[in-house]
């Protein structure tokens, strides 16, 4: 059985990685729009953009698989615990942002995180403690 914490962390790290790659691609698109005076530079930028988009597509495929696996575990949870675990591991939100979005204190968020992860570990097992 897969290590539930590792599965959740993998989904989160891929989400963060893809957000960074997409931001880089958006910057390159803005640069390519301004690079009209030099056709060689524009060609080079477009080629780099195409390569990065292919890499992002591959990463997105991996992320979808990782999120699907993580969601099979998370689906066991309900209510506030699920909202906190899903927000952090699937949507890659910070704890502060989750607290604001869910209208809760950070302390409450951390309590829900702990109880949710404890339930997942009891249900699915884990080699290491939180």
Where in the sequence are the language-model features?
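N-terminal positioning helix adjacent to the helix-turn-helix/winged-helix DNA-binding module
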Residues: 66-69, 73, 77-81, 112
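Short alpha-helical segments used as structural interaction elements across diverse proteins
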Residues: 7, 64, 79, 104-105, ...
């Amino acid at each position: 059985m897969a290590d539930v914490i590792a599965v959740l962390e993998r989904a989160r790290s891929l989400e963060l990685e893809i957000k960074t790659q997409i931001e880089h691609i958006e910057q390159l698109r803005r640069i390519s729009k301004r690079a009209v005076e030099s056709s060689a530079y524009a060609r080079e930028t477009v080629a780099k953009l195409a390569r990065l988009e292919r890499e992002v597509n591959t990463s997105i495929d991996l992320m979808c698989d990782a999120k699907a696996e993580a969601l099979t575990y998370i689906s066991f949870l309900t209510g506030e615990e699920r909202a906190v675990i899903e927000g952090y591991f699937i949507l890659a939100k910070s704890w502060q942002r989750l607290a604001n979005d869910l209208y809760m204190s950070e302390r409450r968020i951390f309590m829900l995180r702990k109880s949710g992860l404890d339930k997942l570990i009891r249900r699915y097992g884990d080699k290491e403690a939180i």
